[in-house]
Swiss-Prot record:
Lineage: Eukaryota, Metazoa, Chordata, Craniata, Vertebrata
Family statement: Belongs to the cyclin family.
Main location: nucleus
Native source organism of the sequence: Homo sapiens
Signal sequence coordinates: none
Record-given protein name: CDK5 and ABL1 enzyme substrate 1
Pfam families per UniProt: Cyclin_N
Length: 633
């Protein structure tokens, strides 16, 4: 009789797998090994106790992330109505258990109420699951007050593992504690035709669990609407959030005038329809998927976006390689910058190693660099030095020609600091000076670069007592001695004669000798009397100033700026000044020389370049000035 009824209705009940269907069907004839609550026929008003839930053993990291991001939408966009979405692992079926009631409590328990409206075909003909379902007994639908199914309505299920999402009517009835009613025929149009793949079982379920998140299912809407009877309470306690997108298609998702009860709380009608809950769950899952994709995109592109935000341009494709070296001899350090750090990764210094150049090449570079005029510096901002290139307006200027050739990994080469080498270098410079006078043009002499670059500095040249004599002196030579007789001359005539003689001997110097000596007296008075600097510091300032004068860098416009910058540089190099002492010195220079503070500070670097960065002076250049300062004080 059970087989005939099943054949007449062409329906069977479904569970998570074929083994679950067999266990649920045989539960009508044989009691399960575990104690189950018996149907309460005598007292239908009192519901039986709810069987213990089987603990779920399939939580995944992705499901935890989806649950955490349930109500979070990072993109801020409303989900499209026809977008695909999946329930993840929530769409999985319940594992086959020992009892029929526990096996029938699947995660899609919402379909327990839908079984009252029609039977659902369990498997395709010829499969073992269909045979077990047909031989175990008829499908017994529950009486309900559902409206009739739509004529011709059917469900098409494609994809593996779809039947695991449906609940068995046998298990649902046993779980709800209701009396089984005689079977009634159901139309063929109200039954769903399921297409299952082979391989059901323990090995196939794990593969199906990964694929059931995105399954397209179309089922009549009336099959999923509960009647709201009290008897279907425990069997219908499912979660709408577990539905995938195919449970209620768009064709049946139009709002209707019927009032459906909520499956979360059966018995309360009309507050929230099942359609609204299903749509809300669908939008929530779409938001979860988009949130996960947005998070992955943010994590992948965070460094690029941060770089664009900080620099305002895309991140460069190729970065400069950084090498940590311990032995500098093993690495090519040319055209690179070396950062010296300690063993604890503390910054110490940064430097570059430049290739060695011959002295002849250095001289050529000096001549070429001396002929270039500094047109980038305006007269309003700063009065520049002639022949000094500062690299303004974005230009790059190299000062490698001012560096002394040294061995970077060994001892320093001999320089002109010693007495013997100084005499040799002086003879070489005199020969170069004579060559320069013979081959140089008048245009190059006007700049003063040739004479100034090749002429060695003599600290006694500008302070020679023979300069004031001029043509007014008379030299008397005797066998044992020589004497000079100077007639009385007006001071103005003597000064004029001295300047003319100095101009004839040094035509590239634009200042007169009397003006140079006057500036030196002002520098000494300001440094010693007003600021309290010592004689060695003043002697260094004299050397700086005379070098600039002999190179032809001084003129009428920048003479006081050069004098003030020389005193400031000498005070910084030769004295250990505090911050307030440097400020006091700048105030005095501004007051005595009537300078602008901003121009004075900005003029330090041009003077430094004109001095070829040679601020540490040898002893033979400073001592003559120091002796004269000590004698006159």
């Amino acid at each position: 009789m059970a087989a005939a009824a099943a054949a007449a209705t062409t329906a069977a009940c479904s569970s998570g797998s074929a083994g679950t269907d067999a266990a649920g069907a045989s539960g009508l004839q044989q009691p399960p090994p575990q104690p189950q609550p018996q149907p309460a026929a005598a007292a239908p008003a009192q519901p039986p106790p709810e069987p213990p839930r089987k603990p779920r053993m399939d939580p995944r990291r992705r499901q935890a992330a989806l649950s955490f991001l349930t109500n979070i939408s990072l993109d801020g966009r409303l989900p499209p109505q026809d977008a695909e979405w999946g329930g993840g692992e929530e769409g999985g079926a319940a594992k086959p258990g020992a009892g029929g009631a526990c096996g029938a409590r699947t995660r899609f328990s919402l379909l327990a109420a839908a079984e009252r409206g029609g039977c659902i075909a369990l498997a395709a003909p010829g499969t073992p699951a269909a045979g077990l379902a047909a031989g175990s007994g008829p499908c017994l639908p529950q009486p309900s007050s559902l409206p009739p199914l739509i004529p011709g309505g059917h469900a098409t299920v494609s994809g593996p593992g779809v039947a695991r999402g449906f609940a068995s009517p046998l298990g649902a009835g046993r779980a709800s504690g209701e009396q089984w009613q005689p079977p009634r025929p159901a139309p063929l149009a109200a039954c769903a035709q399921l297409q299952l793949l082979d391989g059901s079982g323990a090995a196939g379920q794990e593969e199906l669990e990964e694929d059931d998140a995105f399954i397209s299912v179309q089922v009549p809407a009336a099959a999923f609407l509960g009647s709201g009877t009290p008897g279907s309470g425990s069997g219908s306690r499912g979660r709408l959030n577990s539905f995938t997108q195919g449970i209620l298609p768009i064709a049946f998702s139009r709002p209707t005038s019927q009032n459906y009860c909520s499956l979360e709380q059966p018995g309360q009608g009309g507050s929230t329809s099942a359609f609204e809950q299903l749509q809300r769950s669908r939008r929530r899952l779409i938001s979860q998927r988009s949130s996960l994709e947005t998070l992955e995109d943010i994590e992948e592109n965070a460094p690029l976006r941060r770089c664009r935000t900080l620099s305002g341009s895309p991140r460069p494709k190729n970065f400069k390689k950084i090498h940590f070296i311990k032995n500098m001899r093993q690495h090519d350090t040319r055209n690179g910058r070396i950062v010296l750090i300690s063993g604890r990764r503390s910054f110490c210094s940064i430097f570059s190693v430049l290739p060695y150049r011959d002295s002849t090449q250095v001289g050529d570079l000096k001549l070429d660099g001396g002929r270039q005029s500094t047109g980038a510096v305006s007269l309003k901002e700063i009065i520049g030095l002639e022949g000094v290139e500062l690299g303004a307006d974005g230009k790059t200027v190299s000062y490698t020609q001012f560096l002394l050739p040294t061995n970077a990994f060994g001892a320093r080469r001999n320089t002109i600091d010693s007495t013997s080498s100084f005499s040799q270098f002086r003879n070489l410079s005199h020969r170069s000076l004579s060559i320069g006078r013979a081959s140089g043009t008048q245009g190059s002499l006007d700049t003063g670069s040739d004479l100034g670059d090749f002429m060695d500095y003599d600290p006694n040249l500008l302070d020679d007592p023979q300069w004031p004599c001029g043509k007014h002196k008379r030299v008397l030579i005797f066998p044992s001695y020589m004497t000079t007789v100077i007639d009385y001359v007006k001071p103005s005539d003597l000064k004029k004669d001295m300047n003319e003689t100095f101009k004839e001997k040094f035509p590239h110097i634009k200042l007169t000798l009397s003006k140079i000596r006057s500036l030196k007296r002002e520098m000494r008075k300001l440094a010693q009397e007003d600021c309290g600097l010592e004689e060695p510091t003043v002697a260094m300032a004299f050397v700086y100033f005379e070098k600039l004068a002999l190179k032809g860098k001084l003129n009428k416009q920048n003479r006081k700026l050069c004098a003030g910058a020389c005193v400031l540089l000498a005070a910084k190099i030769g004295s250990d000044l505090k911050k307030h002492e440097v400020k006091h010195l700048i105030d005095k220079l501004e007051e005595k020389f009537r300078l602008n503070r901003r121009e004075l500070i900005a003029f330090e670097f041009p003077v430094l370049v004109a001095l070829e960065f040679a601020l540490h002076l040898p002893e033979h250049e400073v001592m003559p000035h120091y002796r004269r300062l000590v004698q006159s004080s």
